């Protein structure tokens, strides 16, 4: 099982918009060295919405190859058409991912019945463990705990990434889904409390730029060391809001580039690079977190 501090990795790109595999390899090595517990490849932060299926699968496969068994890789397999999600799932099933992360279908706003049918179909297309992903702020559909509970009986659905920031859902999900169902926070600002309330891990945006500090916070929270968790959070919590001054992954990709971890900050349309007005704000937050900028 996958626990702890998990990075929602950015997908580095060359100036022409193609994937920068050299920088991708460097990012994988960086997170292994920093102690990150797992990597999500081509999720929301990895620009899954603008990578066609063939390229999407190729990026996940290369991430697995670069990791070479040293860190678990979770492949994003979400789409707003069930047939497309099944296609991605089948394509990712043979590349060596430890699990897959599937966001709720976005824009078309399925009912709970539709969500259950969608995830049932996706899970049936593979033996690889599946993690559900609820982020209504981006998808316009909220998968409530009672809907999640109806999917627990499917053997390869192992957990959910809950990104509403509503901490009351931790207890509700645990009560409805049982102790073995994995609960991951998808909201950096409430991640420490989420873990303290019984969560198992955090799939994080900020982890891209403060992996060591983020892991320290997660480890302390999971072990019940409230003081150490608060101390680790204090040094980086400013980033939890500043990294969302524009739509994710715009700010974090800019920050990763400023750290010299990727060759440039190219991001695919319709997203554009961080607006100049926010450069100072993000640089100040990075400075306060003692991040070296090149």
Swiss-Prot record:
Task: Give the catalysed reaction(s), semicolon-separated.
Answer: L-aspartate 4-semialdehyde + pyruvate = (2S,4S)-4-hydroxy-2,3,4,5-tetrahydrodipicolinate + H2O + H(+)
Q: What is its main location?
A: cytoplasm
Q: Which InterPro entries match?
A: Aldolase_TIM, DapA, DapA-like, Schiff_base-form_aldolases_AS, Schiff_base-form_aldolases_CS
Pfam families, per this entry?
Answer: DHDPS
Example GO BP: lysine biosynthetic process via diaminopimelate
Q: Which GO terms describe its molecular function?
A: 4-hydroxy-tetrahydrodipicolinate synthase activity
Domain of life (superkingdom): Bacteria
Binding annotation for pyruvate: 45, 203
Q: Which UniProt keywords apply?
A: Amino-acid biosynthesis, Cytoplasm, Diaminopimelate biosynthesis, Lyase, Lysine biosynthesis, Schiff base
Which top class of enzyme applies to this chain?
Answer: lyase
Give an example GO cellular component term for this record. Answer: cytosol
Assigned EC number? 4.3.3.7
CDD domains noted in UniProt: DHDPS
Annotated PANTHER family: 4-HYDROXY-2-OXOGLUTARATE ALDOLASE, MITOCHONDRIAL, DIHYDRODIPICOLINATE SYNTHASE
Family, according to the entry, reads as follows: Belongs to the DapA family.
Tell me the HAMAP family matching this sequence: DapA (MF_00418)
Q: How does it assemble?
A: Homotetramer; dimer of dimers.
Protein name in UniProt: 4-hydroxy-tetrahydrodipicolinate synthase
Please name the taxonomic classification of the source: Bacteria, Pseudomonadati, Pseudomonadota, Gammaproteobacteria, Alteromonadales
């Amino acid at each position: 099982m996958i626990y702890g501090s998990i990075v929602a990795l950015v997908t580095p790109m060359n100036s022409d918009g193609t994937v920068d595999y050299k920088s991708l390899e460097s990012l994988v090595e960086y997170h292994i060295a920093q102690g990150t517990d797992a990597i999500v490849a081509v999720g929301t932060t990895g620009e899954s919405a603008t990578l066609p299926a063939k390229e999407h699968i190729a990026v996940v496969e290369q991430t697995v190859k670069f990791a070479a068994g040293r860190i678990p890789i979770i492949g994003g397999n979400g789409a707003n058409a069930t047939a497309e999600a099944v296609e991605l799932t089948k394509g990712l099933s043979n590349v060596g991912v430890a699990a897959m992360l599937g966001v709720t279908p976005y824009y078309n706003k399925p009912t709970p019945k539709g969500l259950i049918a969608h995830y049932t179909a996706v899970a049936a297309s593979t033996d690889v463990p599946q993690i559900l992903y609820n982020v209504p702020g981006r998808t316009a559909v909220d998968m409530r705990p009672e809907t999640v509970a109806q999917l627990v009986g499917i053997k390869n659905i192992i957990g959910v990434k809950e990104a509403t920031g509503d901490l009351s859902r931790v207890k509700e999900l645990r009560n409805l889904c049982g102790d073995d169902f994995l609960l991951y926070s998808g909201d950096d600002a409430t991640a420490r409390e989420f873990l303290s309330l019984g969560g198992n891990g955090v799939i994080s945006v900020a982890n891209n730029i403060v992996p060591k500090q983020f892991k320290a916070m997660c480890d302390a929270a999971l072990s019940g060391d409230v003081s150490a968790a608060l101390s680790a959070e204090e040094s980086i919590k400013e980033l939890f809001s500043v990294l969302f001054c524009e739509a994710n992954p715009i700010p974090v990709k800019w920050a990763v580039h400023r750290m010299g971890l990727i060759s440039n900050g190219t991001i695919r349309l319709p997203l554009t690079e961080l607006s100049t007005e926010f450069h100072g704000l993000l640089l100040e937050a990075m400075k306060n977190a003692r991040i070296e900028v090149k």
